[in-house]
């Protein structure tokens, strides 16, 4: 049994420090690197890419709506052409920096509001999928496990990885509980670690209203910017290894 662990990184902006990239990177197998539209400046992104290359961590483009002020968490109604070119721009920028850092962008994972929107809004999803195909159809799309996006992306000819979240509460339908609601983000490292192990072994989680919700995921997201992120990441990693669950990037075939 194996699982990929990913985290959102490269999100610091100038003197504003976000997350703990240097400490989180050794604990994960994949890194979702900001592309400058919701967070991240070129120097910080480049430093994170170089560390990922040094550690052999797989790199992905964490693309977003153009929303620095809102950290990419505000919904936007962009035209097809706007969203298409915004996503192409971000992927291309990260590909260039990654090449200079000695690594390669292997996948695309949308961020924040864009991630949640295209999970069900297939019109916006089409723009994101087309952006990926225009640049490199071998890029893998990471999306919310159980969402309509997974099948839609496969129908569009893309390789897809279904993702679950370690520290987010789920609704009974498999969607994420809104961050605006109490209990949406989980903070107890031991509870979260046990929950992740059960999610992998039993194929689901207990939703916020107490029902078992099936979730089939190949990657688990660990947020590196929450309170206690380091202790939570360590607890999850240790729990997986203790249970004999191998931590490997989904890009590794064997």
Swiss-Prot record:
Catalysed reactions listed for this entry: 5-oxo-L-proline + ATP + 2 H2O = L-glutamate + ADP + phosphate + H(+)
UniProt keyword list: ATP-binding, Hydrolase, Nucleotide-binding
Coiled-coil intervals: none
GO biological process terms, semicolon-separated: carbohydrate metabolic process
Superkingdom field: Bacteria
The keyword Disulfide bond is annotated on this UniProt entry: no
This enzyme's EC code(s): 3.5.2.9
GO molecular function: 5-oxoprolinase (ATP-hydrolyzing) activity; ATP binding
InterPro entries: Glyco_hydro/deAcase_b/a-brl, LamB/YcsF/PxpA-like
Subunit structure: Forms a complex composed of PxpA, PxpB and PxpC.
Sequence similarity: Belongs to the LamB/PxpA family.
Purpose of the protein: Catalyzes the cleavage of 5-oxoproline to form L-glutamate coupled to the hydrolysis of ATP to ADP and inorganic phosphate.
Protein name listed in UniProt: 5-oxoprolinase subunit A
Organism: Acinetobacter baylyi (strain ATCC 33305 / BD413 / ADP1)
């Amino acid at each position: 049994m194996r699982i990929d662990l990913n985290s959102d990184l490269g999100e610091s902006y100038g003197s504003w420090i976000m997350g703990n990239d240097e400490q989180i990177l050794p604990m994960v197998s994949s890194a979702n690197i900001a592309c400058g539209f919701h967070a991240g400046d070129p120097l910080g992104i480049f430093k994170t890419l170089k560390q990922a290359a040094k550690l052999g961590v797989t790199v992905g483009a964490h693309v977003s709506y153009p929303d620095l002020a809102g950290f990419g968490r505000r919904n936007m109604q962009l035209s097809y052409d706007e969203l298409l070119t915004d996503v192409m721009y971000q992927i291309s920028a990260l590909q260039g920096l990654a090449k200079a850092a000695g690594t390669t962008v292997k996948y695309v994972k949308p961020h924040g509001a864009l991630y949640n929107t295209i999970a069900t809004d297939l019109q916006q999803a089409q723009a994101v999928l087309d952006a990926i195909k225009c640049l490199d159809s071998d890029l893998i799309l990471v999306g919310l496990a159980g969402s309509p996006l997974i099948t839609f992306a496969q129908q569009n000819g893309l390789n897809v990885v279904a993702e679950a979240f370690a520290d987010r509460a789920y609704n009974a339908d498999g969607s994420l509980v809104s961050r605006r609601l109490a209990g949406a983000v989980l903070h107890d490292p031991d509870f979260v670690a046990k929950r992740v192990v059960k999610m992998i072994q039993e194929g689901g989680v207990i939703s916020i209203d107490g029902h078992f919700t099936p979730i089939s995921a190949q990657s688990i997201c660990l947020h590196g910017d929450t309170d206690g992120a380091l202790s939570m990441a360590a607890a999850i990693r240790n729990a997986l290894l203790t249970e004999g669950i191998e931590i490997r990037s989904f890009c590794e075939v064997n």
